A protein has these predicted regions:
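C-terminal ends and interior cores of transmembrane alpha-helices
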Residues: 80-97
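Juxtamembrane intracellular "pre-TM" segments in multi-pass secondary transporters
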Residues: 1-9, 189-230
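Helix-loop junctions on the cytosolic side of multi-pass membrane transporters
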Residues: 96, 123, 127, 169-201
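Hydrophobic core of transmembrane alpha-helices in multi-pass small-molecule transporters
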Residues: 17, 92, 98-116, 234-235
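Cytoplasmic helix-loop-helix junction between adjacent transmembrane helices
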Residues: 106-153
């Protein structure tokens, strides 16, 4: 049973990694496109701002929502919304009407979606992977993150120079169809982690957003190390963004 769970995770991890590659390539290609049109670093910074502001705002309620609803459904809806955004950009590019402000709006929608997608995916991994294999799963996710950092600029720039922004988005949509199909038809994510009694109880309880917030804050108050870690990471990200823009 546990081996089957882990095999499902491997399939899930691979398909999501492929999809992340497509999404990362599109984001990078749009940065290139925006800068080539405007010659302004400010436009690139605004693209990032339009992504992260909705992400931060939506994160306030994302946790309780993810706790209350099925993780697979949330991921499917988020993926579908991201694909619609890519299709919109592709249609505008084909028609010759794509403008930088369109990308600002699309990035805002994508950032909002990611506030639900990323945590839901993280929780889903915990549900798919047996506890004794958590470190292996974490290693694979770290490998994906590092690999994407290296290969995304090369692949996005190469494909963009050869096929334009439309070619990059076409590749992104192909990776979306692959990951979406795998998640929809192949991956079964349990309603609660490991079928535990605690998980079942929480699924039955219809706790409010305020109660979820209170529970989360109580947990953090009892684990001060998490506060220190969160503050440290926030400061690192803030200062690194002063000199680095992806």
């Amino acid at each position: 049973m546990k081996d089957r769970q882990y095999r499902n995770f491997i399939i899930f991890w691979f398909s999501q990694s492929v999809s992340q590659l497509g999404s990362s390539m599109t984001s990078f290609a749009l940065i290139i496109w925006s800068y080539s049109r405007t010659g302004s670093a400010m436009s690139v910074s605004l693209m990032t701002f339009c992504t992260w502001l909705p992400y931060i705002a939506a994160s306030i309620v994302a946790g309780p929502v993810i706790d209350r609803y099925h993780k697979k459904t949330i991921m499917l809806l988020a993926d579908l919304l991201a694909a619609l955004c890519s299709l919109t950009v592709a249609a505008l590019a084909v028609s010759g009407n794509l403008a930088v402000w369109h990308i600002f709006i699309v990035n805002g929608i994508t950032g909002f979606m990611n506030a639900f997608q990323f945590p839901a995916e993280t929780v889903a991994v915990g549900m798919l992977v047996p506890k004794e294999k958590y470190s292996q799963a974490s290693g694979l996710n770290s490998f994906t993150s590092s690999l994407l950092t290296v290969v995304t600029p090369v692949m996005a720039a190469s494909l963009s120079s050869f096929a334009g922004i439309k070619g990059v988005i076409a590749f992104d949509l192909a990776t979306f169809l692959f990951a979406f199909s795998v998640l929809l038809f192949r991956i079964k994510i349990p309603e609660n982690a490991g079928g535990t009694e605690t998980g079942k109880k929480k699924e039955k309880e219809k706790i409010s957003v305020q109660e979820s917030w209170r529970e989360g804050l109580q947990f953090l108050r009892g684990h001060k190390q998490l506060w220190y870690l969160m503050i440290s990471m926030a400061l690192m990200n803030f200062f690194s963004r002063l000199t680095y823009e992806n």
